[in-house]
Regions:
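Short hydrophobic/aromatic patch on the recognition helix
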Residues: 46-56
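Short, basic, alpha-helical segments at the C-terminal edge of helix-turn-helix-like DNA-binding modules
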Residues: 68-75
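Basic, helix-initiating cap at the start of DNA-binding domains
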Residues: 1-43, 61-64
Length: 193
């Protein structure tokens, strides 16, 4: 994200503006959620509204940039778990990490929705939702093969569950509450004896 659309590196001042916008956006989204004023973000970053909109043409694009590193880390964790852990516990561990991250980062829950739901449409390949589908899909597939999860449970079901818990607990922001709810819900996705 530090290159222009032509692939050339950003000028030093443009790179500084980009970083200031991301820093301000992270703070404002943490305080006010995904519906925070873009004008307030530009003001806190010390840039004009046009500068913000030139670099981030939509709210979704700005949210994606703010949360991308964390989502990539969660995707890396999913890939590592597919290689090292038992399928059922691996899936549970990843969903718990995803829930904790989502609850502690206001605004992220909306970004986890498929493009066009909750925020303006975006390129599906460019969304956190698509990244998580790719990473979590393998964990779920392994859990299905191992019989650790009911066959009718989809990744969309699990991401919707994480999203609903995150949105429901966003006001108190307590990851323990969200984790407790997730564990209760996950007990329902295990196969019946």
């Amino acid at each position: 994200m530090t290159e222009t659309t032509s692939g050339r590196p950003l000028r030093a001042d443009a790179r500084r503006n980009y970083q200031r916008i991301l820093g301000a956006a992270e703070s404002v989204f943490a305080e006010q959620g995904a519906d925070a004023s873009l004008e307030e973000i530009a003001r806190r970053a010390g840039v004009g509204s046009a500068t913000l909109h030139r670099r981030f043409p939509s709210r979704r694009a700005l949210l994606l940039a703010v949360f991308r590193d964390g989502i990539e880390a969660l995707c890396d964790q999913a890939r590592a778990l597919t290689e090292k852990a038992e399928p059922g516990p691996a899936l549970t561990s990843w969903l718990r990490a995803l829930t904790a991250y989502t609850v502690s980062h206001r605004g992220l829950a909306l970004l986890l929705l498929p493009a066009g739901v909750g925020l303006e449409p975006a390129n599906q390949d460019d969304t956190c939702h698509a990244m998580l589908n790719a990473a979590g899909g393998q964990l779920l597939k392994q859990a299905h093969v191992a019989g650790a999860v009911r066959p009718d449970v989809s990744l969309a079901d699990l991401l919707t569950l994480v999203n609903a818990i995150s949105l429901a607990t966003e006001a108190d922001g307590n990851p323990r509450t969200a984790d407790r709810l997730l564990v209760m819900a996950l007990n329902g996705v295990h196969p019946l004896p």
